[in-house]
Amino acid sequence: MMRGGMGNMQKMLKQMQKMQKEMQKAQEELAEKTVEGTAGGGMVTVVANGHKQILEVKIKEEVVDPDDIEMLQDLILAATNDALKKADELANEMMGQFTKGLNIPGLF
């Protein structure tokens, strides 16, 4: 009975190591993937990667009004929040396969 138990433990350990490598690969892929958040009908675009790092902010010239800086700030904020939401969704999609069936709040 002990021998069967040890064999199962080794098998489980190998499965965990495989899953850990797959998770690490998925994390690396997340860093490479990008998402775009937009606001103002595409007047402001924010690009982020799957790790929620902002990589680029694009602002169309026609939206820049020195007399209405507040509107531009609002558009940048909205586009940034949109990009971060999409980055979260991407991470959940990619990493969710590893946590499927586990009920750990806030993991992914």
UniProtKB/Swiss-Prot annotation:
<feature type="compositionally biased region" description="Basic and acidic residues">
    <location>
        <begin position="19"/>
        <end position="32"/>
    </location>
</feature>
<comment type="function">
    <text>Binds to DNA and alters its conformation. May be involved in regulation of gene expression, nucleoid organization and DNA protection.</text>
</comment>
<feature type="compositionally biased region" description="Low complexity">
    <location>
        <begin position="9"/>
        <end position="18"/>
    </location>
</feature>
<protein>
    <recommendedName>
        <fullName>Nucleoid-associated protein GK0018</fullName>
    </recommendedName>
</protein>
<dbReference type="Pfam" id="PF02575">
    <property type="entry name" value="YbaB_DNA_bd"/>
</dbReference>
<keyword id="KW-0963">Cytoplasm</keyword>
<dbReference type="InterPro" id="IPR004401">
    <property type="entry name" value="YbaB/EbfC"/>
</dbReference>
<dbReference type="GO" id="GO:0043590">
    <property type="term" value="C:bacterial nucleoid"/>
</dbReference>
<comment type="similarity">
    <text>Belongs to the YbaB/EbfC family.</text>
</comment>
<dbReference type="GO" id="GO:0005829">
    <property type="term" value="C:cytosol"/>
</dbReference>
<comment type="subunit">
    <text>Homodimer.</text>
</comment>
<dbReference type="InterPro" id="IPR036894">
    <property type="entry name" value="YbaB-like_sf"/>
</dbReference>
<feature type="region of interest" description="Disordered">
    <location>
        <begin position="1"/>
        <end position="32"/>
    </location>
</feature>
<dbReference type="GO" id="GO:0003677">
    <property type="term" value="F:DNA binding"/>
</dbReference>
<keyword id="KW-0238">DNA-binding</keyword>
